[in-house]
Amino acid sequence: AEGFRRITFFPDRPDVMARYTCTIEADCERFPQLLSNGNLVAKGEADGGRHWARWEDPFAKPCYLFALVAARLDVLEDVFVTASGRKVRCAVYVEPGKLDQCGHALAALKKAMRWDEERFGLEMDLDGYMIVAVGDFNMGAMENKGLNIFNTKYVLARQDTATDMDYQNIDRVVGHEYFHNWTGNRVTCRDWFQLSLKEGLTVFRDQEFGADVHSRAVTRIQEVRTLRIAQFPEDAGPMAHPVRPASYAEINNFYTATVYEKGAEVVRMIQTLIGREAFRRGMDLYFARHDGQAVTCEDFVAAMEAASGVNLTQFRRWYARAGTPRLHAAGQYDAAAKRFTLTLTQTLAPTAYEARLREAGLPVEDGPLHIPVAVGLVLPDGSDAFLAQTRVLSLTETCQTFVFEDIPATPVASLLRDFSAPVHLDFEQTDTELAHLMAHDSDAFNRWEAGQRLATRVLLAGIAVGGRGNDWIPASFVTACARVLEAGLRGVRDSAALAAEALTLPAEQVLAEVVAGQGRVIDPDAIHRARIQLRCH
């Protein structure tokens, strides 16, 4: 974030935007490639076996996006034709001898370019786009304008050594850095407190790219698993902070799961509340208002409000509150009136962040959050009670009751479909109800979630006996898993990948958090033994 000040004197702030012309001169033999941001406008030979290249970036940018590469590298290149008919040179530069491992990354870049045109109407704005991958780059990747710098982990892949996840990660990271070209570069953040403006939004965009390129259901499951393992503990610990913190001692400490992953969930909730079409209009308005500017999270939310007509005043609290909200749900069915009543209650426990604010004399945000709760009601025959399958409820009070009429039979409630909000859910459901959701829920994420909750219950029973033996494993759970596997083997596209996720047991870290939440002592050995025993049963 603040590396340019180590190169030369400069007002090193993200809101100081300038156009750069960079001339590089070096020895031809040692440094055959001379690269920088923007378009190559001139090059030539110099005295003494040297050569030079002049790069001009026509778009104003903050200095943290400057990059310069002088090296001996191999290059794999191709041409991408934009929606308007422009030809863009796409190039991947790697250390000599590794060119055969770059094909997937180059293809991923072209896929990302096409997807951004189709989904958000955003076209590549330069004559060329370059990726430079080196093994000792200290981050995963960086979105320097037109010249992305990558660690080789997210570029190099060979079919005989790389896994499916390696290829997916290359797709996602290449996409993420390219998507920054608009959400981060063309429109950047006014100050580092607004880091999630570009990172949360761009993570959301790369998540949507991954969902469209691969499996939407599997991608969402993987995202939520990461959120629960990496971000929820951060929210519950001494380093808890909101998506937009009020203070920091060191900017490098800002690159957290909260700013990135929870920030993406905040953007996703906006789309859930206003709808996908209105969200696209909001993105169009955001760029129309702020292209070439350094702006704030408030500017982004304001564009979404203006484009949708939805008041997001209360929703803004998500940007200022630390911690993971807890959502308690209770449902009741009146057979005579054919009415289902759902009561939702939200709480948010104080975190160490609020204590630090009070010590510093800074204001503390309070009041209930605006939580989108996507709900479905699954009838005994496995069908959805709603014609539209899912309804999005706006929980804006500490406690609210929602009434659903003309429900013909006792339903099983499917809450937080597609994980519509980053919260803990407390909702008592029987094993039979969870098994029903696992088999019939039209929401793929909640089918997986029901299976995870069932597996957690089984594993907690095993942990209680130290993970020894197998008489704590119910036959009904084994049967349910067999049905999932059978469905995956005879299903349609992506069903095998979804079945693999459904049969993956909750992580040991997740189980440890559940045990701790019950007030019990965490026994890592018992957790490990129980998980291995169930997996091998």
Question: How would you name each of these model-derived features?
Answer:
Residues 254-288, 323, 328-360, 364-366, ...:
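Long hydrophobic segments that form regular secondary structure
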Residues 17-23, 50-52, 145-147, 339, ...:
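Extracellular structured ligand-interaction cores
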Residues 228-229, 256, 405-537:
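Long, ordered, helix-rich scaffold segments
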Residues 311-314, 322-415, 508, 512-515, ...:
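Beta-strand-rich binding/interaction modules
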Residues 60, 97-99, 154-155, 209, ...:
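Short, glycine-/Ser/Thr-/acidic-enriched flexible segments
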Residues 1-77, 361, 443-448:
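Extended, low-hydrophobicity, Ser/Thr/Pro/Gly-biased non-transmembrane segments
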Residues 55, 84-332, 336-337, 342:
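Hydrophobic alpha-helical and helix-loop surface patches within well-folded domains
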Residues 41-51, 80-86, 332-338, 396:
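Short, ordered beta-strand-loop transition motifs
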